[in-house]
C-alpha cells in the first residue's frame, strides 16, 4: 500500500481512448519488466507495480483515465527521488505521445 504522505504523484495527459492508453502503458511495463524485473498486475484501468530498480524498492499504481494517466509511487527518500520522478514522467510522455510506435 502507498501512503499519501510519503508518495510521489505525476499526471500525464494523453489523447487516446482508454484501451489504447492502457496498451501503450503496457509497452512501457513490458520494457521495465525486461530491463529491471519490475512486476505489474492490472485490475481494470489500474496497474500495480513492484520491484527494485538500481537497488531501490519501488511500489506504484498507475491509473488510466480518459485524458490522462495518474502515477502514484512510494517516495524512496533518497537522493534519487527527483531523478526517478523525472525518469517516470519522461517515459510516460514518450509512450503516450501520439507519434510513438512500438518497434
Predicted segments, located by residue:
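A short local loop/turn or secondary-structure capping micro-motif enriched for an aromatic residue
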Residues: 57-58, 79-81
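Short, charged/polar low-complexity linear motifs in solvent-exposed/disordered segments
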Residues: 40-41, 66-68, 76, 88-90, ...
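Terminal, regulation- and interaction-focused segments at domain boundaries
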Residues: 1-38
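Beta-strand elements of well-folded, non-transmembrane domains
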Residues: 12-18, 53-55, 64-66, 73-77, ...
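Ser/Thr-rich, low-complexity intrinsically disordered terminal regions
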Residues: 23-70
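A conserved amphipathic terminal alpha-helix motif
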Residues: 80-103
